[in-house]
Regions:
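Structured, solvent-exposed acidic/aromatic patches
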Residues: 122
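Short glycine/proline- and acidic residue-enriched helix-loop micro-motifs
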Residues: 125-131
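N-terminal glycine/serine-rich phosphate-binding loop of ATP-dependent small-molecule kinases
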Residues: 2-103, 113-114
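Carbohydrate-associated surface elements
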Residues: 109
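Conserved small/polar residues in nucleotide/adenosyl-binding loops
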Residues: 132-138
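Active-site metal-coordination/substrate-binding segment of hydrolases
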Residues: 115, 119
Length: 141
């Protein structure tokens, strides 16, 4: 299906954050028209562990986008582009068929604290930073 972007009128911004997903609709002059937000559950399976259900994340993104589009009766062909931000260094794994293997490990999780301290003690923190462009966390954060 061919979409003529010159006839399109809207931009969508998706902010998939640590506690909720938000979608914001802008007109072609970048004036905010409306927004939708949906929170999702935080899982704390043990002290220092923070996880999210990937399906809840995905559903919250879909719900917010669908809601703002239906609220203003906008078709996908009316959308010029979509920008997406996400929640820092949260990680999740999929199998080769795209099935989620487990809950997402949230950036606030402290299960790697001991490993990060070992890297610092070995003096290879700068090497880790050169690969990731992230500082090693202190106490897991």
């Amino acid at each position: 299906m061919y979409i003529n972007v010159f006839m399109s009128k809207y931009y969508i911004s998706i902010d998939q954050g640590t506690t909720s997903s938000r979608a914001v609709l802008y007109d072609s002059s970048f004036n905010q028209i409306t927004q939708e937000q949906q929170e999702f559950k935080q899982h704390y399976p043990a002290d220092g562990l923070v996880e999210h259900d990937p399906e809840e994340i995905w559903t919250s993104v879909l719900n917010t986008v669908n809601s703002l589009m239906s609220k203003k009766d906008i078709k996908s062909s009316d959308v010029i582009s979509i920008g997406i931000t996400n929640q820092r260094e949260t990680v999740m794994l999929w199998d080769k068929d795209g099935k989620v293997l487990d809950k997402a490990i949230v950036w606030q999780d402290r299960r790697t604290t001991e490993f990060c301290e070992e890297l610092k003690a070995k003096g290879i923190e700068s090497e880790a930073v050169s690969y990731t462009h992230l500082t090693l966390p202190t106490n897991g954060l």
